[in-house]
Amino acid sequence: MAISAATIDPSRVGGNLESAHAILAGLDPAHEIGFALAMNKLMTVHLNDQNSIRYDQDKAFGVENLRQAFNQVKVLKENGYGEHGEYVGLDVKAMRTTKDEDSYKHLENSLKIFKALEAKVDKFDYDFQQKCVEERDFEALEMYVMNLLMGVE
């Protein structure tokens, strides 16, 4: 995406970030989303999850790494993604041995997790984050996020 500025028409260049593909490349999906958003090049995003650098698993969003999923939802919400017609795709597939009648549960689960994480982002205390940054108390910030995700007061 960065090299798109050197093309004849940079406005025609954009990307579709898929969480699992970023993970497969050893990257953090939230950082990749943030980079694309900063360049105004995120055309769509496909959220899913991945257990390390195996084959492309297309697991339900957030089932392997809840914190990583939270960070993705947070960066999308902070940047108003979706307010101008953009959409979030759920690029997931049913597990190989899933019964036909359960073949949509992975989509339902992904959507439930996404909405639950949106609610967590809405509760995020940015003033506390700023205080932690100013005091360089990143352990407190890390624990705050974990407590938020776990529902611990």
Feature map (PLM): residue ranges:
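Histidine-acidic metal/acid-base catalytic patches
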Residues: 1-153
